[in-house]
Amino acid sequence: MKKVRVFAPASIANLGCGFDVMGLALDEVGDILEMTATEGSGITITNKTDVPLPEDIEDNVITPVIRKFFEMTGLSGHIDVVVCQKIYPGSGIGSSAASSAAAAYGMNELYDCPLTDEQMVICAMEGENLASGGEYRGLL
């Protein structure tokens, strides 16, 4: 059993004339996930916050990130995710992006960093695809 605790900051991207070219990350606002890998298979997500999250894991952006990681690496395991701090969805400061990034980074840490930064972005994009209802193409 291996456990990690990861933080992904909230972000603001539409800064004045920079539109989506300039952005910033916030120091203390963000998502904190505790992730544990054990033998077996499956995903459990427990919400320890007051922020409402989907009850069905198929509707949570964390799930496709974990699945993409396993697909890309050929690894397996049961992943237990505890959401300890959460950006409120729809707040405009990157709630789905923070969850997706934290899940991708956490998975990479749990499994001793088999993915490059670019590969972690590919995993995180799976969560963003779910959140946006479409697929982001041509980013990498």
Predicted feature locations:
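Gly/Ser-rich oxyanion-binding loop with an adjacent helix/lid
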Residues: 76-140
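ATP-binding N-lobe of GHMP and related small-molecule kinases
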Residues: 1-91, 109, 113-115
